[in-house]
A protein has these predicted regions:
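Conserved alpha/beta-domain cores
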Residues: 1-161
């Protein structure tokens, strides 16, 4: 392994404020890199492709906390619901309801972040701030017993400054 996973992980962790947890984005990285990070204490990993996540989840240690970090189609929720710990990009009430439905089938509660669209790029997903306020005000989400809204996720536009 040419890449120094342990060394780089220690550099990042050294600069994090107390109480901040690192989600190591592991998509496209081989299991040996994830295992090296795991051996150094990293326990939260983020993936954005359901099939790659499923393969890694099957072979890596079972105490890893898996976060789904990309856009998630409703028809893919059923594949990750048995083991996912958090879905970081919920962009609609429809998706929230599907997560609840699939989590209930496995007698689980799945943590989620509501994704807000604040970027200039049209390619980004998310609720508008007004749509998010409306979703929360309408209160239908309160009846969803198998999801827990933990906060918001936003992706800013990539700029020079």
């Amino acid at each position: 392994m040419d890449y120094d996973v342990a060394g780089n992980l220690h550099k990042v962790l050294r600069n994090l404020p107390e109480g901040v947890r690192l989600v190591a984005v592991s998509k496209f990285h081989p299991n040996e890199f994830l295992q090296a990070a795991y051996n150094e204490g990293q326990r939260i990993f983020g993936e954005s492709h359901e099939q790659e996540l499923a393969k890694k989840q099957e072979t890596l240690p079972k105490d890893i906390k898996w976060h789904f970090i990309g856009h998630l189609q409703t028809n893919k929720v059923k594949y990750i619901a048995p083991y996912i710990d958090m879905i970081e990009a919920v962009d609609s009430l429809k998706l929230l309801k599907e997560i609840n439905k699939q989590a209930a089938k496995h007698n689980r509660v799945i943590d989620v972040l509501l994704e807000l669209h604040i970027a200039q790029e049209a390619t980004k997903y998310g609720l508008t701030p007004d749509a998010c306020r409306q979703l929360l005000a309408d209160g239908e989400w309160r009846q969803l017993e198998n999801v827990r809204i933990c906060g918001l996720m936003m992706m800013a536009s990539n700029t020079d400054d």
